[in-house]
Amino acid sequence: MSEYQYVEHEFAPVYNEESQVLVLGSLPSVKSREHGFYYGHPRNRFWKVVAAVLGVPEPLTIEEKKRMLLAGHVAVYDVIRACEIIGSSDSSIRNVVPADIKSIVAHTPIRAVFTNGKTAGRLYKKYQAEHIALP
């Protein structure tokens, strides 16, 4: 059986002064950390779905992914800054240190926050939602 590891978030949030929608995950998976960017597992459909929603070709490189997000006014980050976790198992997450979502929202015209999974949604509600004022 795998053991718990203390993991600190390795990626900066992706946003700019024009971001209007914030998509939050829980914490980058092992594969994403190996890849060096959000949603890096080859079977993850995030980039395909966002590209389809925005009506643009699916990005292949990290720089293309960042450009697509920013051009589409989409910000991406995670609700966890650090935690203990077994592998990539969201159900094993414990001892959460929440990420600073409030400062992103304070410096952007974010109008909506979406979470991309049950754990991200639960942790957003627990640690951040009450501190975020959306229009």
Model-derived regions: residue spans:
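Residue-level preference for short coil/turn positions at secondary-structure junctions
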Residues: 17-19, 70-72, 109
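Glycine/proline-rich loop-helix segments at beta-alpha junctions forming the active-site rim
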Residues: 2-9, 13, 83-135
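Short His-Asn-centered micro-motif
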Residues: 24-25, 77-78, 115-118
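Short, surface-exposed acidic-centric catalytic microdomains
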Residues: 31-92
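Active-site and ligand/interface coordination hotspots across diverse enzymes
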Residues: 1-48, 106, 125-130
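Aromatic-residue detector
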Residues: 26, 55, 59, 121-124
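A short linear-motif detector with a strong N-terminal bias
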Residues: 1-3, 16-19, 53-57, 92-94
